[in-house]
Each structure stands twice: as C-alpha cells, then as structure tokens.
C-alpha cells in the first residue's frame, strides 16, 4: 500500500460518537487491492471498492447460506448494498447466530478469492438515542472489515 501497512485499529474511548484510529508502519511499497466489507445498521452489508467477482460471490453466498435471505440488493451511492431480512447484527439471538455464521462464510469466500484479512475497525460515529432522552443509546453501525489482495 504505497509504503504503509496497517498495524492496528485502536479504540481508546467508550464514547458513542468516537471511532477507532488506525496505526500504520512504513514498509516497502507493494501493489495491493483493498476493499471493505462494511456492516451497517442492523441488517446491511456494503462492499466498498469491491471488484465485480467479489460482489457476485457475496451475493450468491448470502442467497445460498443466509437462512433469512436478501430483502433488497441495490447501490448505496456507488457501493453495492445488501439489505438482509432480520437483524443479523442488531438483535435477537437467532438472527445474530445466523449473522455471525454468514460473516465467517463471507470471510472464507474472500480468502478463496485471494484476499487476506487486513483489519477490523469502528469507523462510524453514528449512534441511536431515544427521543425521550432516556439512557438508551447505542452505536448504529458495527465494525467494518478491510481485506487486501496483491494486484497481479
């Protein structure tokens, strides 16, 4: 990555509106393709900077292996977005169990396409706050995962 490699994503605050900060180290330059699997709200997957082969494999894997299926597939701006049925990263033990299983499967699919896991980080400062000013506050988005593969 142009002479820099990611070392860590650090969370140094419990504040809801804070994000991870990324630590890099200097390395010899290497041509890599980076993409992000971004988990949004309680039921969305966005594939940022993902090549078309990845989008197809992810789509097929979700349709085949995620019990509750895809509610909608469309672009969010220029980014492919899958809105899943249920709340795989937001609620209910059953949905969460299937969501975790799906994420491990997607990670395996990306590895088979030559991608390596680079880092997981909280990069969204969005959070929900009840309108009645109660203490019910929680982050809307969970960690995003970055993957890299050499450009050949």
Where on the chain are the PLM-derived regions?
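Short, structured interface segments
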Residues: 19-28
